[in-house]
Amino acid sequence: MSWLEKILEKSNIVSSRKASIPEGVWTKCTSCEQVLYYAELERNLEVCPKCDHHMRMKARRRLETFLDQGERVELGEELEPQDKLKFKDSKRYKERLAAAQKASGEKDALVVMKGAVLGVPVVACAFEFSFMGGSMGSVVGARFVRAVEAAMEHNCGLICFSASGGARMQEALMSLMQMAKTSAALERLSDKGLPFISVMTDPTMGGVSASLAMLGDINIGEPKALIGFAGRRVIEQTVREELPEGFQRSEFLLEHGAIDMIVDRRDMRQRVASLLAKMTGQASPLVVSVNDAPNEAPYAVPEANKKG
């Protein structure tokens, strides 16, 4: 080995210290793969500023950014899941629950809060998809019924942000029963003349889409949200036909009348508050009082020329 090769040998070269970048500062859009400053993405409600892709949002953050500050009260937080069936597949259900609670920071897959949106009273609930795929079990059903009862008690509307893969298989029939339980609760809400607005986010599938998510007086979808019962691959294998482009996306569902409207997440507060106000007979938060309108400049109507 020559003297030059010894100098250039990697072991003799002092490596330059890499600048350490704290984790969580940068992230990447899951659609266009644009590198994004995470703080800016948070301010934009998890919507990519380049391609407007709506990323999945934590349930608690969704409610905290949707409801007015200072008026939020959580409901049903004392309810916790139990492994009554002692269920075990590749892993015990208790272990799955513990892992999901640690990863998501929630006790179960639904968060319920009472509050107001732009001054309009409302009870709102949101699914936490990172908790076992937002699956609906007995606690999710119980918390949703608690939300319905709170809406009836306070004579206000109910809104639910769905993000779920469906019923929780580890709870077997008890999870399937929640489909009927939540649907019956919404029937009581309807009998009292109170509105239910369902917002379907990406993804809303399975037993949740087949029950509470599609029972809204107004059904709203977020842009490009996956909404349906069975997955595309399962349907294609069953019917043995190729499905059209964009099948089960919110735009496709709107075009075919399955949902009522698509609303950008950044416009959700104003749109929902306006709908709730109209459906409950309250003053719309978007309507400005006539007394608050700016005064017009004085204008004199010219007299018509008199004929001599």
Curated annotation (Swiss-Prot):
It comes from the Bacteria. GO terms for biological process: fatty acid biosynthetic process; malonyl-CoA biosynthetic process. Its EC number is 2.1.3.15. GO terms for molecular function: acetyl-CoA carboxylase activity; ATP binding; carboxyl- or carbamoyltransferase activity; zinc ion binding. Pathway: Lipid metabolism; malonyl-CoA biosynthesis; malonyl-CoA from acetyl-CoA: step 1/1. InterPro entries: AcCoA_carboxyl_beta (IPR034733), Acetyl_CoA_COase_Trfase_b_su (IPR000438), ClpP/crotonase-like_dom_sf (IPR029045), COA_CT_N (IPR011762), Znf-ACC (IPR041010). A zinc finger (C4-type) spans 29-51. It holds the Pfam family Zn_ribbon_ACC. One of its GO terms (cellular component) is acetate CoA-transferase complex. Zn(2+) binds at C29, C32, C48, C51. Keywords: ATP-binding, Cytoplasm, Fatty acid biosynthesis, Fatty acid metabolism, Lipid biosynthesis, Lipid metabolism, Metal-binding, Nucleotide-binding, Transferase, Zinc, Zinc-finger. Residues 25-294 form the CoA carboxyltransferase N-terminal domain. Binds 1 zinc ion per subunit. The keyword Lipid metabolism applies. It is found in: Cytoplasm. Signal peptide: none annotated. Its cofactor is Zn(2+). Its main location: cytoplasm. It is an enzyme of class 2 (transferase). Component of the acetyl coenzyme A carboxylase (ACC) complex. Biotin carboxylase (BC) catalyzes the carboxylation of biotin on its carrier protein (BCCP) and then the CO(2) group is transferred by the transcarboxylase to acetyl-CoA to form malonyl-CoA. Belongs to the AccD/PCCB family. Acetyl-CoA carboxylase is a heterohexamer composed of biotin carboxyl carrier protein (AccB), biotin carboxylase (AccC) and two subunits each of ACCase subunit alpha (AccA) and ACCase subunit beta (AccD). This is Acetyl-coenzyme A carboxylase carboxyl transferase subunit beta. The lineage of its organism: Bacteria, Pseudomonadati, Pseudomonadota, Gammaproteobacteria, Vibrionales.
